[in-house]
Amino acid sequence: MEAAQDHGPGLCCKPGGRLDMSHGFVHHIRRNQLDRDDYDKKVKQAAKEKARRRHTPAPTRPRKPDLQVYLPRHRDGSTHPVNPDCEEASESSSSGSSELEPPGRQLFCLDYEADSGEVTSVIVYQDDDPGRVSEAVSAHTPLDPAMREALRSRIQEELAKRQSRH
């Protein structure tokens, strides 16, 4: 079976069974294939550019401030401070005594914020004197006598409230 058989004078097939490239329909098919290849290249290039743009850092936007998280005390009843800020303040406030921690159970951590925004943290224990705690706060943040007395009375109220619960 040869495709190059001569079928008569009306048919114009070339020997070898090849397509007649001079025909307009074949030119249209080839042009369509080339256009499709060019389009695919453009789409792939655009996808690569878009992927590169995604990896660039986004402009910084203001974030929400850190939320205060409740940290419960340890079940074993230990007096380890749960707030790292309080640990530093307790070390500095108890530097005058020979013990590292006063005897007794830790009741709460007092955070005093001054008008300047500076926060002073002091751990208050069960056996603490409210006057001593207010002096420890005023050592870090200067307080006038009226403010010191108001702080002492507030510490006294908080101590009484917490000692009555336990």
Curated annotation (Swiss-Prot):
Residues 32-107 are annotated as: Disordered. Pfam families: UPF0561. Signal peptide: none annotated. Coiled coil: none annotated. InterPro entries: UPF0561. Residues 32-49 have a biased composition (Basic and acidic residues). Residues 91-101 have a biased composition (Low complexity). It comes from the Eukaryota. PANTHER family: UPF0561 PROTEIN C2ORF68. Belongs to the UPF0561 family. This is UPF0561 protein C2orf68 homolog.
